[in-house]
Amino acid sequence: RFLDRFPTVADLAAAPLDDVLALWAGLGYYSRARNLHRCAQDVVARFGGEFPRSAEQLETLPGIGRSTASAVAAFCFGERVAILDGNVKRVLSRVLAYEGDLAQARATRALWDIATRLLPRENLARTMPAYTQAQMDLGATLCTPKRPDCPRCPVQDLCAGYRLGEPTRFPIKSRVLKRSSQTLWLLWLRRADGAVWLSQRPVCLLYTSPSPRDKRQS
């Protein structure tokens, strides 16, 4: 339904945000829909409706960070640029037994440099999409965070973490995320005739039962 309603970047850019969010229901976080809408508007306004073809320009679009921009450029245009999402960080850190603490910006920058040096150098239109996809798939399916399937790994012979006998020690990241909890109330108000009171949420612009939190956000 989403693609039927917005078949082109121009169609998405011209649509009201309410329409975009309504059709996004069930497709993921609404922040992604808002970024997608802003991105489409930016592509139309700054690039004449044609997506830029370099990672550097792609990264200037709303909602697109360095790794996503590089992935698009590598897959679509064969550009020689590295990605460094969670899966790739884990794969490279284990293969290299990388001792840098990825909670520190300096260590992450150094890993970016290493990832770039390891990129293919020939026949980039074919090798860059394949290499990029291979790293992502390896991290998602075999080189998992807690139970890496080392016996089936195609780069086992190259993996310094495996040779050390402790691949799960990598990547090193000292910062621990603090978890928090929140209690929310949702009001269900119905008239005698069966009508239900709905209010528009200020964040996602969709209609739902009112919540005390809505007042704080409006």
Model-derived features: positions:
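Catalytic cores of DNA base-excision repair glycosylases
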Residues: 1-151, 155-168, 181
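Residues in intrinsically disordered, low-complexity segments of regulatory proteins
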Residues: 23, 111, 184-187, 196, ...
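Generic structural motif recognizing short loop/turn segments at the entrances and edges of beta-strands
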Residues: 166, 194-195, 209
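Conserved N-terminal beta-strand and adjoining loop/helix that marks the start
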Residues: 171-196
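Beta-strand scaffold of nucleotide-dependent catalytic cores
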Residues: 197-201
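Conserved small/polar residues in nucleotide/adenosyl-binding loops
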Residues: 207-214
